[in-house]
A protein has these predicted regions:
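Context-gated lysine
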Residues: 22, 54, 133, 188-189
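Helical subdomain adjoining the active site within ATP-dependent kinase catalytic cores
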Residues: 7-118
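Forkhead-associated
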Residues: 145-195
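Short Cys/His-rich micro-motifs in 6-15 aa windows
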Residues: 116-127
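Intrinsically disordered, low-complexity segments enriched in small/polar residues
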Residues: 5, 15, 24, 132, ...
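Long, charge-rich C-terminal accessory regions
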Residues: 125-152, 156-158
Length: 195
């Protein structure tokens, strides 16, 4: 048995303990914790390239107050929809094949250019669906935004979640097919769409 008379080695500030283990145990604050910047980082990608507002709120609830109080964490129910919404707002760069949010403005070009290689964003189709308050008043923000680039001669599959409530079992089911060609753009209902 080893004994150190200077004190307990586990209490030393610069011990060699695994910082990742401490993080997994909830002993360190989240890197973006709004109330504790002890574990913050200036390195890595900007959060605006990684997280939507909805994902940011979920992460903050999970790893902020929820880090030490599990009952404050959002349930698993909220994550699939937030992740699908984030994925539906990304485009693929034709220059480097990286993905990024369609509304990103590159700080150097002050335009919609890829954050990784500055290639201009391709032309995109933006579909927005709204929930309604009464029969003739839409709520202010769209409940879903679906963004995809449309290269000539391609077919785009629009999933059911754009038009209907998000359901885990069928949110990816093709509802509408959009194809682009020399003669124009064709929009048709999928064979798998609801009647």
């Amino acid at each position: 048995v080893l004994f150190r008379s200077e004190g307990d080695w586990a209490d030393e500030e610069n011990d060699d303990g695994d910082i990742e283990d401490k993080a997994y145990a909830g002993l360190l604050p989240w890197v973006d914790d709004q109330n504790d910047d002890a574990n913050s980082s200036d390195s890595g990608l900007p959060r605006s390239l990684l997280l939507t507002a909805k994902l940011t709120a979920l992460f903050e609830s999970t790893f902020g107050p929820g880090r030490t109080s599990p009952l404050l964490r959002p349930t698993i129910y909220h994550w699939p929809e937030a992740l699908a919404q984030a994925a539906d707002m990304t485009v693929t760069c034709p220059g480097c094949s990286m993905h990024y949010y369609y509304d990103f403005i590159h700080p150097e070009t002050e335009a919609h250019h890829c954050p990784y290689c500055t290639t201009p964003r391709p032309q995109v189709l933006i579909l927005e669906s709204y929930r309604w308050k009464g029969t003739d008043t839409p709520l202010e923000l769209p409940c879903w935004r679906y963004v995809r680039e449309i290269p000539p001669g391609s077919e785009l599959t629009v999933p059911r979640r754009v038009f209907d409530e998000f359901l885990m079992l069928d949110s990816d089911t093709a509802e509408v097919l959009i194809s682009s060609g020399d003669e124009g753009i064709l929009i048709k209902k999928s064979d798998h769409a609801r009647s």
